[in-house]
Curated annotation (Swiss-Prot):
Cofactor(s) of this protein: Zn(2+)
Name of the molecule in the record: Dehydroprecondylocarpine acetate synthase
Record GO biological process: alkaloid biosynthetic process
Tree of life domain: Eukaryota
SUPFAM superfamilies attached to this UniProt entry: GroES-like, NAD(P)-binding Rossmann-fold domains
Effect of residue 54 to A: Normal activity
Keyword annotations from UniProtKB, A to Z: Alkaloid metabolism, Cytoplasm, Glycoprotein, Metal-binding, NADP, Oxidoreductase, Zinc
Record Gene3D superfamilies: Medium-chain alcohol dehydrogenases, catalytic domain, NAD(P)-binding Rossmann-like Domain
UniProt source species: Catharanthus roseus (Madagascar periwinkle)
Residues the entry annotates as binding NADP(+): 194, 196-197, 216-218, 221, 279, 281, 303, 305, 350
InterPro entries for this protein: ADH-like_C (IPR013149), ADH-like_N (IPR013154), CAD-like (IPR047109), GroES-like_sf (IPR011032), NAD(P)-bd_dom_sf (IPR036291), PKS_ER (IPR020843)
Localization (cell): Cytoplasm, Cytosol
Amino acid sequence: MAGKSAEEEHPIKAYGWAVKDRTTGILSPFKFSRRATGDDDVRIKILYCGICHTDLASIKNEYEFLSYPLVPGMEIVGIATEVGKDVTKVKVGEKVALSAYLGCCGKCYSCVNELENYCPEVIIGYGTPYHDGTICYGGLSNETVANQSFVLRFPERLSPAGGAPLLSAGITSFSAMRNSGIDKPGLHVGVVGLGGLGHLAVKFAKAFGLKVTVISTTPSKKDDAINGLGADGFLLSRDDEQMKAAIGTLDAIIDTLAVVHPIAPLLDLLRSQGKFLLLGAPSQSLELPPIPLLSGGKSIIGSAAGNVKQTQEMLDFAAEHDITANVEIIPIEYINTAMERLDKGDVRYRFVVDIENTLTPPSEL
C-alpha cells in the first residue's frame, strides 16, 4: 500500500519567501504546505516576523545542517486561527507568538528540567526536520502550525511589530541575565555592541535596576546609548585611556557581538569573580586568554535563547515595563535589501517584516 503523498500529509497550502538552494543567498516567493492542525496544535496567521543575524547566516549557508529550500524567520507574532481539541493554552482570535524552538525530545536531562532549548534534539524554527521527518519552514510566510507547548501568549499591550524581536534578541539577553544572577538592582553591567541584541540588553538591564555602560568601537553610538536608550555610561573600546580607567569596575559583561573580536581587554574590566556572558555567535573561534580568568576568579557563561516558560515570563515582563525593540518595519519585497543592510550593520536596530499587509500569494498557488 502506497504511503500518503506530501500534499495529503500537509493539506494546508502556504506561501512565503525562501532561499531556494545553498548557492544564491537570495530570497524569492515560494509555495509549500503546512501540516494539518493536530489535537495539540495551534494554527497561526502570521502578522509580523522579525529578522535576526541567525536568519542572515542561514541564507548565506553558514550552517551546514540546514535543509533547502529554506524559509527563514524565528521571531513570529500572529493570531490563533484554529486550535486542536486538546489545546488549553490559547483560544482562537488571541495574539500568540513563536520563538526559535518548535519541539524537543521530551526525555533527556535538559527536557525534564525545563531546559528544552538545550535539548540535543531540539527542533529549531526552520531548515530542520520535525518529529514526522518533514522540514520546518519559518516565519516569512502567511501562516504556520505549532504544538501548543511551544506557543506563547502575546500580551495585548505590546506592539506586535516592536515585540517580534523580543522572541530572539529579547529572550537571549533576558535569559542570560536571569540565569546568571545579573538581574539584581545596583549591579554594574557592561553591554558590548549596540545592535539588535545589544539595545534590548540595555533595555532589560535598566528595567532590572542595573547600572549600564555600553561598550562600543563606534563613537557615534554614544548619544543613542545614553540619551536614546538610557544607559548610564559609554566606553569607547578603541580608547586605551578609557579602557584603562574602567579596569575592575564591572560586575558583569554582556557580549552581544557576532564578529570575531579581542576578549582579553574586556575581561580586564571585570571585578574579581565577575561574569562574562557570551551571547553573540561569531563564525570563527574567539581567542580565550586563561590568565585573566584564573587570576580574578572570573567566569565565561554561554547562553542561547531561553526555554518556553522563561520566554513567556520575558514577554510579560516586557509588557509590564513597556519594553519593545526599536524597529524598521519593511514590506516583504524589501527583504533582500534588508539582508544586505543587516550584513553591513545598517539598521537601528531591527528589521521587522509586515507579513499581514505585504505578503501576497504567488501565482498558481
